């Protein structure tokens, strides 16, 4: 059956700290073009690989991968809030299939997700509730992290399952590219932050959430003035990564360790593993071709911002 893929960077800073209007218009055109192609594809099912930013997953239990059999977006940074339309029976069947493939996938019947999941559904489909979705969390910030190889194998297992469904499937990857915003780390946390990282942050009081969001906004403003205030963006790495995906050379990423990736491109760059999972899933459908590649480093959003599509060849 036919499948379509789109991978897109996300940023909570849209509307809070934006680049100049010409750049913003350029990004909006890229997203609008991707949205048009997706609408023409008319998906019957979406599989969304995305990370979390200590809004739904914490160190009380931190799985490398988790499939939401029920999921709700919290609406952080003015992103869309509400329930995701997860087809529960299909999600359960998917979980069984992936576990039977030898991949240790966790499940959640009450998964809480943030802008990392909400933004691609908003930007590319027009809302959270437009198409049934299987939301798959990939841990991209909370060490210890899954590596490229294990993430690729997860994607391949997902693709084999999807290819049995006889549906038009849209495969989305959300995150990256190179970036290192001010994400907390357990090893450096004081007592209050440690409590939040161990699960106390799941239901933050509104004033504390606002202070947390303002810290990110302030960091972005500083980064536009002083590129040394955060880990620099790495356009060379970002473009190399996108080229490897376009050429189907996913396994070449297996040799890159997590510490090496953090040093090259920033500690939140591990979100790009959502792109790897998406392309690995697409590979189960047979021949495909890429299209719509876009890349620009955008310091206002603390991100190497990328967009890339691919479609199976019938």
From Swiss-Prot:
Its cofactor is Fe(2+). It is an enzyme of class 1 (oxidoreductase). Its EC number is 1.13.11.16. It comes from the Bacteria. GO terms for molecular function: 3-carboxyethylcatechol 2,3-dioxygenase activity; ferrous iron binding. The keyword rRNA-binding does not apply. The keyword Iron applies. One of its GO terms (biological process) is 3-phenylpropionate catabolic process. Keywords: Aromatic hydrocarbons catabolism, Dioxygenase, Iron, Oxidoreductase. Pathway: Aromatic compound metabolism; 3-phenylpropanoate degradation. CDD domains: MhpB_like. It catalyses: 3-(2,3-dihydroxyphenyl)propanoate + O2 = (2Z,4E)-2-hydroxy-6-oxonona-2,4-dienedioate + H(+); (2E)-3-(2,3-dihydroxyphenyl)prop-2-enoate + O2 = (2Z,4E,7E)-2-hydroxy-6-oxonona-2,4,7-trienedioate + H(+). The active site is at residues 115, 179. InterPro entries: DHPP/DHXA_dioxygenase (IPR023789), Xdiol_dOase_suB (IPR004183). Homotetramer. NCBIfam families: PRK13370.1-1, PRK13370.1-4. Catalyzes the non-heme iron(II)-dependent oxidative cleavage of 2,3-dihydroxyphenylpropionic acid and 2,3-dihydroxicinnamic acid into 2-hydroxy-6-ketononadienedioate and 2-hydroxy-6-ketononatrienedioate, respectively. Belongs to the LigB/MhpB extradiol dioxygenase family. This is 2,3-dihydroxyphenylpropionate/2,3-dihydroxicinnamic acid 1,2-dioxygenase. The gene is mhpB.
């Amino acid at each position: 059956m036919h499948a379509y893929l789109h991978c897109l960077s996300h940023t909570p800073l849209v509307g809070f700290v934006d680049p100049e209007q010409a750049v913003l218009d350029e990004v909006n055109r890229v997203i609008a073009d991707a949205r048009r192609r997706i609408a023409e594809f008319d998906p019957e099912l979406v599989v969304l690989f995305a990370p979390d930013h200590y809004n739904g997953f914490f160190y009380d239990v931190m799985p490398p991968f988790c499939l939401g059999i029920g999921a709700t977006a919290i609406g952080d940074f003015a992103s869309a809030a509400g329930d995701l339309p997860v087809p529960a029976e299909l999600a359960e069947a998917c979980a069984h299939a992936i576990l039977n493939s030898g991949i240790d996938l966790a499940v959640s019947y009450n998964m809480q997700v943030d802008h990392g999941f909400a933004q691609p559904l908003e930007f590319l489909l027009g809302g959270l509730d437009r198409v049934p979705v299987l939301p798959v969390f990939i841990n991209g910030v909370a060490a210890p992290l899954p590596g490229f190889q294990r993430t690729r194998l997860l994607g391949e297992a997902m693709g084999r399952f999807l290819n049995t469904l006889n549906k038009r499937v849209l495969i989305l990857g959300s995150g990256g590219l190179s970036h290192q915003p001010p994400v907390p780390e357990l090893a450096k946390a004081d007592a209050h932050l440690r409590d939040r990282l161990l699960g106390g942050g799941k239901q933050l009081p509104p004033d504390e959430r606002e202070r947390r969001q303002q810290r990110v906004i302030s960091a972005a403003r500083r980064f536009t003035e002083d590129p040394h205030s955060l880990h620099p963006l790495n356009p060379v790495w970002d473009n190399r990564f996108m080229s490897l995906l376009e050429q189907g050379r996913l396994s070449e990423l297996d040799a890159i360790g997590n510490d090496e990736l953090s040093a090259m491109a920033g500690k939140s760059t591990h979100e790009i593993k959502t792109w790897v999972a998406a392309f690995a899933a697409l590979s189960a459908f047979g021949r495909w071709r890429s299209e719509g590649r876009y890349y620009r480093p955008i310091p206002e959003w603390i991100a190497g911002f990328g967009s890339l599509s691919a479609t199976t060849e019938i």
